[in-house]
Amino acid sequence: MKKGFTLIELLVVVLIIGILAAVALPQYEKAVEKSRISALFPIAKAVETAQKTYFMANGSYSNDMSSLDITVPLPTALANPPCSLAHESSDSSRQDAQTVVALNNRTSAKSYFVAAARLTGPYACSGIKIPMTDVGALEAGRTYCYEHIGHFTGTAGNFCQRLMNGKYVTSFDSCRFYQLP
């Protein structure tokens, strides 16, 4: 009697491995993207705290990263941050190849945000925004997930609802905002 596996048994094993890979790979990619965005939370919160400190000392919010009492661990300062993040100065953001953190201020509209976004991947130009003041339906100090309508290539809610478990709040300024749990 010969010992070994039959062709059918080998095909069944290959089929099972294929099914497991088809299920596991999208979940793995989702976990990687969520961890990349999660890495921006502490940076955005630190910039928010620095903005609050600046406001307490000066009575207004800063438009310049260099005037805040913080060093953002991203190397490049940009005059025009990507993803249509508003800017009021040439020192309003920091970025590397994959992420950007910006003082997303529009003093004329009295809207002041700290924004952090991904620049690459399936959720490019999506990220988190923290309003410094109440803006429409958005509450000051609460962290919101956002998808920039003009740059986001995915289905609405794909990033903020499905990946970040956000609840839709409002749309304005070319962004969909979702409240994070």
Model-identified regions with their sequence ranges:
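Aromatic side chains
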Residues: 5, 28, 54-55, 61
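Periplasmic/extracellular, small/polar-rich flexible segments of pilin-like filament-forming proteins
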Residues: 57-181
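N-terminal alpha-helical signal peptides/signal-anchor transmembrane segments
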Residues: 31-32, 40-58
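Weak global preference for isoleucine
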Residues: 8, 16-19, 37, 43, ...
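N-terminal single-pass transmembrane signal-anchor helix
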Residues: 1-32, 36, 40
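Short linear sequence motifs
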Residues: 18-22, 47, 105-106
